[in-house]
Structure formats: structure tokens, C-alpha cells
């Protein structure tokens, strides 16, 4: 009964008039992502597992990564997926649908597309180091994507930490850590050094706060920098991002 109500819920127009809908699910409705996921499970997941049993894939909502061995296979699978989606009333996104070459030291050929972003991570050729053989090489690795890094920096800036001069450092850290711990938990699973610029950006705001709060630091960036280094040394767990090893 509740599912039926969700599906038949009218659409509120800009002029305040309720319009009756005849298809689809309400945009932003609680049932919409659930129904979409069930639909794609049978419309895509079950189909590709049956038609291409040797091809691995990952799907999150309507974003999919399909792993192929050769370019020829990739083109065949892409064409088949296009036909399948058309048969169930969907289509491939013309800009986001790409064949990407996973370039590394063992796959050195040159292709136009050598990176993609999935679930906030950007996968591309990156420098790596073999500790056993003590040599550098290129691997195809994920790291927090540029878009997500920019989003995190903007979020940090929006907090305007420097205005909270009536708070002490521990009170300042509380709400900040609630958000930053989530970022670190997800985005440091692979290539954690990618998030260090965000950590330094947060440190910059902490130092701005310190210069406004303490008169002895007000006109000295050097002393503020030394102050922050001292706090990190005394209380390395005060801010969640300080658990990463990086220079200020």
C-alpha cells in the first residue's frame, strides 16, 4: 500500500498546482533509489552475468564499471549493453560511457582514455614503489578524485573556523572530527597521500583561528606555524586528520 502511494504521489509544480503523474517515480522520493536498484539488478546485473559470465563488473546505483580483457571485447560488451538498456527503456550516457585503457608498467601502450572516476575515486596510472625490489614503477591505482578533493576543501572553508574564537581547541575539534573521520575512513583506503592537501587546508584554517584568538600569534605566521607543530606533537590525536603523516 505504501509503495503504491509513493508511486502515485502527485508532482508539485512551481506554481503550487499538484499534477497527476502517469509514469516514473517521484524525484527525491524515499522509494525511488530502492526501486531503481531493484530494476537495474534484474535489468542489468542478472542479464550481464548470464550473457557475459566471464566479465566482471561493479555497479553503484546507475554507475557501472565493466572489466574487459581486450579493446575488441570492450566494444562488443558496450554495444550489447546499449541494446539491452534500450530494450528496457534506458540508454547509455553519451559523455560518461567510455572505454578506458588501464595503463601501467606492464601495459605501456598509448590510448586517449587512461582514467575514470567511480564512487568518488579516480583510477589512473600512478607512481608506486616496490619495497621488495626497491624500485619505482607505474600502477593503475585509485585515489580520491579531484572533484571530491575540491568539494572537501570548500566544505572546510565553509565552516569558517577562524570565527569561533570563543571556543578552545578541543571544542573546535569535536564537530570538525565528526566530518573529517568519515572522509578519512573512505578516502584513505587507497593512496591516502591524495587527501593531504585537504589536511593542510584544514590546518591553514586552524592557524587563522589561532592568530585571531591569541595576541602573541596575531602578526607572526612563523610563530603560528611553530605553535601548531607543538600542538600536534603534544596531542597528535586531537584532530582526526593529524593521524596521517605529513609535513605542515
Task: Label the predicted regions.
Residues 1-248:
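Non-catalytic terminal/accessory segments
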Amino acid at each position: 500500500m505504501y509503495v503504491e502511494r509513493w508511486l502515485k504521489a502527485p508532482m508539485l509544480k512551481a506554481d503550487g498546482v499538484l499534477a497527476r503523474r502517469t509514469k516514473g517515480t517521484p524525484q527525491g522520493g524515499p522509494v525511488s533509489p530502492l526501486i531503481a536498484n531493484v530494476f537495474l539488478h534484474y535489468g542489468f546485473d542478472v542479464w550481464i552475468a548470464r550473457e557475459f559470465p566471464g566479465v566482471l563488473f561493479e555497479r553503484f546505483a546507475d554507475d557501472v564499471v565493466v572489466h574487459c580483457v581486450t579493446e575488441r571485447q570492450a566494444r562488443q560488451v558496450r554495444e550489447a549493453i546499449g541494446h539491452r538498456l534500450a530494450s528496457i527503456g534506458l540508454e547509455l550516457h553519451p559523455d560518461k560511457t567510455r572505454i578506458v585503457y588501464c595503463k601501467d608498467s606492464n601495459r605501456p601502450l598509448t590510448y586517449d582514455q587512461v582514467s575514470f572516476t567511480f564512487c568518488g575515486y579516480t583510477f589512473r596510472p600512478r607512481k608506486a614503489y616496490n619495497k621488495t625490489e626497491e624500485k619505482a614503477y607505474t600502477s593503475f591505482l585509485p585515489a580520491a578524485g579531484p572533484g571530491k578533493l575540491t568539494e572537501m576543501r570548500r566544505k572546510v572553508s565553509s565552516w569558517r573556523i577562524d570565527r569561533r574564537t570563543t571556543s578552545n581547541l578541543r571544542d573546535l575539534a569535536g564537530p570538525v572530527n565528526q566530518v573529517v573521520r568519515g572522509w578519512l575512513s573512505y578516502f584513505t583506503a587507497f593512496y591516502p597521500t591524495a587527501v593531504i592537501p585537504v589536511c593542510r587546508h584544514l590546518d591553514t584554517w586552524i592557524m587563522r583561528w589561532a592568530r585571531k584568538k591569541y595576541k602573541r600569534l596575531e602578526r607572526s605566521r612563523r610563530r603560528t606555524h611553530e605553535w601548531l607543530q607543538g600542538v600536534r606533537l603534544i596531542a597528535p590525536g586531537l584532530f582526526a586528520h593529524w593521524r596521517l603523516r605529513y609535513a605542515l
